């Protein structure tokens, strides 16, 4: 499903984020990316939906070289990818339901179908009863679950998450981790950058150290 072939990523003036990364992620896998702060975890994830482009090497998603895609082709790549990053970018002046509806509205989904999908996504993460609440009224764990619901509302086959349990207490972190595990169990390919691999028992671990697989 995903193949990294001799990937390097450098930032000016002379910062190496990733160096000579070659690995493959199979469809349906649950993979955790482990490493200290600055190890390159976030950068590696951002290469997959072409948020970042590699300095060298090739990233293939379903056989497609994402680094060569033009701006017009990116929406077609990203519609099959769910993204959950540390900066959730929730709209705090809109309800939980409205936040989840937004990706479907942007892509022109019929309203009734969009409403049904958004409510189903909220239900999957245990937030349907809070559908009318503003994000400011939600706890940190609930806000993270809301971000997950928004990421999966378009039913992607690949789910990427960057430290989704950061700043959460132990019990809440495990609750959030379990949501990703459940999506993996129904066939979604899941990649999670995490500081605590114990939250994802049974996951294949990809360890990064100073931008290299260790």
Q: Model-flagged regions — what are they?
A:
Residues 57-65:
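Conserved ABC transporter NBD signature motif
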Residues 153-157:
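A short, proline-enriched helix->beta-strand linker immediately N-terminal to the Walker B motif
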Residues 159-162:
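Catalytic Walker B motif of ABC-type/P-loop ATPase nucleotide-binding domains
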Residues 49:
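Helix-to-loop junction immediately C-terminal to a conserved catalytic motif
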